[in-house]
A protein has these predicted regions:
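Alpha-helical membrane insertion/targeting regions
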Residues: 2-188
Length: 188
């Protein structure tokens, strides 16, 4: 892939790209605070607008960043839908055993801390696949959305497009994992 430099006036990115990344950063934490889902919608709309404007003006770097932002929101939504579909599928596969259903109802009505609920849910016979799928899809949604956002921000700092960031993308992944695993440990 061609490495686009953003040092000349034809390839500089404007403040709207930075605003898009700020919205994506907020959207990355939408599973903790559902109100932040609106930031994803705003980032999507802003990304489409910026992409159209960049295409009109022939600004390749800005176009690449706007496309990266749009793709990040759509990827997050796709991961959420696939995760929910998998959870529904595994839950259907578990069946509707009355004892299991009564235990699930008891857990969902409880006021225990989330980690305790997860431990009790894990103890239900046949629920391990569902717990693994729920935790895995949630972690993938949280980490991958934040990783792409941080990769975009790091690419702005390095003056390249997000896709041509190189080995620094691993730093974005490491930061995303540390943030998304660290926040629940602090909050829970």
């Amino acid at each position: 892939m061609e490495k686009l430099s953003m040092n000349d006036s034809g390839t500089r990115v404007g403040g709207m790209i930075w605003a898009g990344y700020a919205l994506l950063l907020l959207f990355s934490f939408s599973l903790y605070w559902s109100l932040l889902l609106w930031a994803g919608l705003a980032a999507l709309a802003l990304g489409y607008y910026q992409r159209r404007q960049a295409r009109k003006c022939g600004m390749q770097a800005e176009y690449a960043h706007a496309q990266w932002q749009v793709n990040t929101v759509w990827l997050a939504l796709l991961l959420a839908v696939v995760g929910l579909g998998g959870i529904v599928g595994v839950a259907g596969w578990m069946g509707n055993d009355p004892a299991v259903m009564a235990r699930l109802d008891e857990l969902s009505a409880g006021d225990q801390p989330p980690m305790e609920m997860l431990r009790q849910f894990w103890a239900i016979p046949g629920s391990k696949a569902l717990v693994v799928l729920m935790c895995g899809s949630t972690l993938l949604y949280l980490v991958w959305t934040l990783k792409r956002t941080l990769q975009g921000l790091l690419s702005l700092w390095q003056c390249v497009t997000p896709a041509s960031l190189g080995s620094v993308r691993w730093l974005a992944l490491l930061l995303a994992v540390l943030l998304q695993v660290g926040i629940p440990l602090v909050l829970l």
